[in-house]
UniProtKB/Swiss-Prot annotation:
Taxonomic source organism: Shewanella baltica (strain OS155 / ATCC BAA-1091)
Record-given protein name: Alanine--tRNA ligase
UniProt comment concerning the protein's domains: Consists of three domains; the N-terminal catalytic domain, the editing domain and the C-terminal C-Ala domain. The editing domain removes incorrectly charged amino acids, while the C-Ala domain, along with tRNA(Ala), serves as a bridge to cooperatively bring together the editing and aminoacylation centers thus stimulating deacylation of misacylated tRNAs.
GO molecular function, one term: ATP binding
Database matches in Gene3D superfamilies: 2.40.30.130, 3.10.310.40, 3.30.54.20, 6.10.250.550, Bira Bifunctional Protein, Domain 2 (3.30.930.10), Threonyl-trna Synthetase, Chain A, domain 2 (3.30.980.10)
Top-level taxon of origin: Bacteria
Catalytic class of the enzyme: ligase
GO terms under biological process: alanyl-tRNA aminoacylation; negative regulation of DNA-templated transcription
Similarity field: Belongs to the class-II aminoacyl-tRNA synthetase family.
EC number: 6.1.1.7
Length: 874
């Protein structure tokens, strides 16, 4: 009998393979053919174009075990995960599909046969639903399969609109859809609930296990239902639900996969109660997070990356609730790979990247989690009523990185609701402030609306005749301008490249007899190209013909930098992993800036490897080839596209040997060898999960190398050596410095011992305890600890507080002998003093240090110490 999840997956695929179906691998969780979907959320997603007749396959029957995520967008189960028996962010959808091959009867028969013969489920435990008008499905179930009429339930439009029914399936607001028939399993009368369609249908007794969709229509945005070219079948059965039945449990969280993950999470965190709901959340979330990262999604503040971040942070919060004190979430990945078996093939290949990304995100959130939870706890304790205000929810989001649903999750546990409307208002106000700041000093011409088109000739020429079709000054259309006027000039055709895709706009001149217009920038205005600049001499008017001349040197240098970003992108993906994707770029004549997704700083060795890889491709002198083709053809060829960019149906593809292929409308060199040299000048993080590389090429790269060489030679001269001996000389100097620092520390200890002898006499006795409170002048902060140790030895049973003020900063130390820490703790003592000098600190009960930023308050703060100690020694 098939019992484990892995056995069920294999049995399902084998059943349909033996019935003429092609076994197709699960597609990525990032839909490749549907921009309307955030994540793959059903088995049919990868076949959408097949159902629409737009994609031809060499098979008409298929079966899959599809990985799915439902978190964000229309299908969003995140809020319920952990609180119900069957909600998940990640699940596997077993499915069989017919593309114009078999239809209702065969689809129904396949489902019934697999359940009752292969899995041997008792027929009396099964009932089915159909759409209210689907008489054909009723006849098949009743007459041909033999299901009693009373076990066939008709479901009408129960969601307030036509075709809005549990038994009329649609993937989204538009697209393939049709009536469906669902198979339900009766878990028994010991569980509350009624049959589908009854008042008690929301109970957990009758559970839907298989949905058989009869794809007959393509729903338009207008709501019109157009017949599909060929009626088809799409079915889906959640593997978690059927596994629960086969393993004799009621909750999905009791099946083998979740038992393993829950036990491992409990072991890592140190929890003994395996029924904790937080363990369910963690076990569910590791599946969605790990597989999303394996499919190229990285935590970020937008789109898919933000949904991933929300899920990770929700899991981390639940771990914190269970008592986790260090990063734990990433440690579940090996167990996940083991328990998922064949379904984790892609995950196993990217295991190291997945673990690093999860750990980095977890550690980043841990820095603000405790403080954020503290603020939330205070707000909830002080709350009057049952609603947390939107301002507080926004503050937690904006300052501490708490997604709203994480705050709502905490509130839910205390029967508090969040003011979502208030949160959205606060968000809108922040966007308005950001927009206002961004518009400060804005160019009047930036918002021009130009109803014209400019043809671009700059791929093949840098100069050519053109006719002026419009002129704008200060946002207003004019017919002519005179010498000295600043304006935007629009031409009917231009070799000037308008800023786009990170490449800056061209500079140059528009010239005619006695006329020279200096172009300082080129921008797109809809379909028109605007040449921004100033008229140096003569007069210009609409209708005039000019010679448009691009600055060749600037264009050439820009092209070097643009072409190398393609090589850099490919090299980063090769060295760091295929999760790397471009997040932004700036390409100008002087340098290039490339932003990309990555979860940690790029190591020096990795940067060196990337740089060498790019320079190798430059030396290979690949010819750059460009081609216009359909977007689907480009993607089939493996062309990289920027996430979030909108592309036309026809795109331009730039290829550099077999190393790089990208969609790009920019201008490029003829061969990679033209770039000459590539040199990385810096690498840094600019946002969570986003890194930035700055680099130079060609002559600028040579100048950079020459500058580094000059600095190396200058350093060599200072060290009285040559460039070849700099490292050895510097190492010797550092060793000498360390020795001097060691000797200095020893000298300070001796001075501290001498100073302590003088200070002992300043101690006062409080209830038999020596108490020394002293502000020290001219004493280095680094000497305080040694001085405190000396004083403790001399005073024996003692409490000591020392403070110094230097360069606008306060340094404090408190020491308490071991016999007194039951009454006075050094950490509490130093924290009290630090709070009065604008600082904070802490440490052990016997010794603690702190700092502050208000030296003017040090005397008053130290004056509070004796009463504080006296009270505790009383």
């Amino acid at each position: 009998m098939y019992q484990t999840t892995a056995e069920l997956r294999s049995a399902f695929l084998e059943f349909f393979r033996s019935n003429g179906h092609q076994v197709v691998d699960s597609s990525s969780l990032v839909p490749g053919n549907d921009p309307t979907l955030l994540f793959t959320n059903a088995g049919m997603n990868q076949f959408k174009d097949v159902f629409l007749g737009m994609d031809k396959r060499n098979y008409t029957r298929a079966t899959t075990a599809q990985r799915c995520v439902r978190a964000g967008g229309k299908h969003n189960d995140l809020d319920n995960v952990g609180y119900t028996a069957r909600h998940h962010t990640f699940f596997e959808m077993l499915g069989n599909f017919s593309f114009g091959d078999y239809f209702k009867e065969e689809a129904i028969r396949f489902g019934w046969t697999f359940l009752t013969e292969t899995l041997k489920l008792p027929k009396e435990r099964l009932c089915v639903t159909i759409y209210q008008t689907d008489d054909e499905a009723f006849e098949i179930w009743n007459k041909k399969i033999g299901v009693a009429a009373e076990n066939i339930i008709r479901i009408g439009d129960n969601k307030g609109a036509a075709y809005a029914s549990d038994n009329f399936w649609q993937m989204g607001d538009t697209g393939p859809c049709g009536p469906c028939s669902e198979i339900f399993y009766d878990h028994g009368d010991h569980i509350w609930g009624g049959r589908p369609g009854s008042p008690e249908e929301d109970g957990d007794r009758f559970i839907e296990i298989w949905n058989i969709v009869f794809m007959q229509y393509n729903r338009q945005a207008s709501g019109e239902m157009l017949p599909l070219p060929k009626p088809s079948v799409d079915t889906g059965m959640g593997i978690e639900r059927i596994a629960a039945i086969m393993q004799g449990v009621h909750s999905n969280y009791e099946i083998d996969i979740f038992r393993t993950l829950i036990a491992k999470a409990a072991e890592i965190i140190g929890v003994s109660d395996l029924t904790e709901k937080s363990l369910r959340v963690i076990a569910d979330h590791i599946r969605s997070c790990a597989f999303l990262i394996a499919d190229g999604v990285m935590p970020s503040n937008e789109g898919r990356g933000y949904v991933l971040r929300r899920i990770i942070r929700r899991a981390v919060r639940h771990g914190n609730k269970l008592g986790a004190t260090e990063a734990f979430f990433y440690k579940l990945v090996p167990s996940l790979i083991a328990v998922m078996g064949d379904a984790a093939k892609g995950l196993a290949e990217t295991q190291a990247i997945v673990e690093k990304a999860l750990k980095a995100e977890e550690e980043q959130f841990a820095r603000t989690l405790e403080r954020g939870l503290g603020i939330l706890d205070t707000a909830l304790n002080e709350l009057k009523g049952t609603t947390l205000d939107g301002e507080t929810v926004f503050k937690l989001y904006d300052t501490y990185g708490f997604p709203m649903d994480l705050t709502a999750d905490v509130c839910r546990e205390r029967n508090i609701i969040v003011d979502e409307a208030g949160f959205e208002v606060a968000m809108a106000e922040q966007r308005s402030r950001a927009q206002a700041a961004g518009n400060f000093g804005a160019d009047y011409n930036a918002a021009l609306k130009i109803d014209a088109e400019t043809a671009f000739s700059g791929y093949t020429e840098l100069a050519g005749q053109a006719k002026i079709t419009a002129i704008y000054q200060n946002g207003e259309s004019v017919t002519a301008i005179k010498a000295g006027d600043e304006a935007v000039v629009v031409l009917d055709v231009t070799p000037f490249y308008a800023e786009s895709g990170g490449q800056v706009g061209d500079k140059g001149q528009l010239v005619a007899s006695g006329v020279e217009f200096t172009v300082n920038d080129t921008q797109k205005y809809g379909q028109a190209t605007g040449h921004q600049g100033v008229l140096a001499t003569g007069n210009l008017s609409v209708g005039q013909v000019v010679e448009a001349k691009v600055d060749k040197k600037l264009r050439h240098r820009t092209q070097l930098n643009h072409s190398v970003t393609h090589l850099l992108h490919a090299a980063l993906r090769q060295v760091l992993g295929t999760h790397v994707s471009q997040k932004g770029s700036l390409v100008d004549p002087e340098r290039l800036r490339f932003d990309f997704s990555h979860f940690e700083g790029v190591k020096a060795a990795e940067l060196k490897e990337v740089e060498e890889l790019v320079n190798t491709q430059i030396r290979r002198n690949h010819e750059l080839k460009t081609a216009e083709m359909g977007i689907d053809e480009a993607k089939e060829k493996g062309a990289m596209a920027l996430f979030g960019e909108k592309y036309d149906s026809q795109v331009r593809v730039v290829t550099m040997g077999d190393f790089s292929i990208e969609l790009c409308g920019g201008t490029h060199v003829g061969r990679t060898g033209d770039i000459g040299l590539f040199k990385i000048t810096s690498e840094a993080g600019i946002a969570a999960g986003v890194r930035r590389i700055e680099a130079v090429t060609g002559a600028a790269a040579m100048a950079y190398v020459a500058q580094q060489q000059a600095e190396l030679e200058e350093a060599a001269a200072l060290l009285k050596g040559d460039a070849n001996s700099v490292v050895a000389k510097l190492k010797a100097q550092l060793d000498k410095m360390k020795q001097l620092e060691k000797e200095m520390a020893q000298l300070k200890d001796k001075l501290a011992a001498a100073a302590s002898a003088d200070l002992v006499g300043d101690a006062v006795v409080v209830n038999g305890v020596n108490v020394l409170i002293k502000k020290l002048d001219g004493v280095e902060a680094s000497s305080l600890r040694g001085l405190q140790d000396e004083l403790k030895q001399k005073l024996k049973s003692a409490i000591i507080v020392l403070g110094t003020a230097q360069e606008g900063k306060v340094n404090l130390i408190a020491g308490v002998s071991n016999d007194l820490i039951g009454k006075v703790k050094a950490g509490e003592l130093v924290a009290m003093v630090a709070a009065q000098v604008g600082g904070k600190g802490g440490g052990r009960p016997d010794m603690a240090q702190a700092g502050g930023s208000q030296p003017e308050n040090l005397d008053a703060a130290l004056a509070q110490v004796l009463p504080w100690i006296t009270e505790r020694l009383a």
